[in-house]
Amino acid sequence: WGHARLALTDPWRLLAAAAVVTAARHLWQRTPSIAEALPVRLRTLMSAAATRAALRTGVSTRVAVLLVGFFAVLTIGFPNGRPPSRFDDNELVNLQGRWDAGWYLQIATDGYQHWTSNPATQENIVFFPALPLALRVVGRVLGGTLPAYMAAGTGLVFVAFVIGLAYLYRLARESLGSAESADAAVLLLAAYPFAVYYGAIYTESMYLAGAIGTWYHFRRREWLPAAAWGVLVGLTRPNGCFLSIPLALLLVSPWLPGWLAGGQTLSMADPRPRRVASLVTGGTIDWREAAYGWLTAAAPGVGVLLFCAWTWWLTGDPIAWARGHAAWGRSYLGLWPIIHTYGHWLSSEGLYTVTTHIPVDVLNLCGALFVLALTVPVWRRLGLAAAAFILVNMLPPIAAGGALSAGRLSAVMFPVFLWLASAVPARQRPHWVAAFAVGQGLCATLFYTWRELF
């Protein structure tokens, strides 16, 4: 079992399979042909307001952050004068090989490997497969060299980020009701200090696209695309399965008391009422539609179960990936011990002393506390499901790892940015964006110079 691996060894087989699928589609539906339909669809896509906003914001902010990281490396340098690991002597090529990116690149090039059952030994089994599998495919198509994999990873996360921003724009446009608010939501999320990870070879971009894509299609009762995005979320990161909880709350929210359901901004809504007006028709439940909804809500959990099945085949333990997190400093302690520890430090040492001793932890906690503090306002304006999305994605990791990566986790809390876009007056938004952008510059400097912001 320990030598089993899943690998793509020949990209030409993938391209041949794509050609077969294309030919089959042409035989099944000859008109319009792909050559006729594709340019029209591309023009429609590129002319959409969501696409323009996502491209404009996504590309400009990611390129700017990479430039900040590059010049931080050249001017500030690394701790101890050298990086902990180096993939290439060229700092531009080496720029994206930071922290977890090295593990994703290892999986993409060598596959999953399992040597020991010792939970204190770091192994790549803890990293979920969606990003490294896509990285392997694209990297091999681009030539299979290290720069090719670096370029593939950067391109993948850029594309995923743009898709996530486009979905955020569409969701904000439908739920908040104005293009100005949609633009604000996109810009606020992209400028957020911990949005630095959207340009790194990390899973944040893919998770953002999957989570918002699932939510967008789910509330419109477009079950198939919602389920597809949901499975992707489950295959992207360990907490992907938690998306099933707010999706389930979206389904039951019409039956909840008004005080509990909260706002209805992100609730179920179909702009085409003749298609499916509700899960309730004529006073009775549409059981077929309800079944589709519950099955779709389970899709993120299905994605995690698929990876559990794979790890069971590889290691004999379906949750080996969960046990392996202990080697990264994640073991369940509970929220109260975490709160008590930090509270004791603050009361005995003071904020200044604590900040000077653990500045990165304090920075991470600032991000976590920011989004958690907005849970109640999000609930009151956007709904219980939106608030639950924040809680189930923030509290369990904090209970298991404290401040570790808490800021990074806060970056994908998209309901927070929808709330900010709806609550912050238009005249004040530039100030929020400017403050966020300065913070992201700091985070980029720390991350790309190998300070412990991961």
Which residue ranges define each predicted feature?
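Transmembrane-helix motifs of polytopic, lipid-linked glycan transferases
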Residues: 135-137, 152-175, 370-374
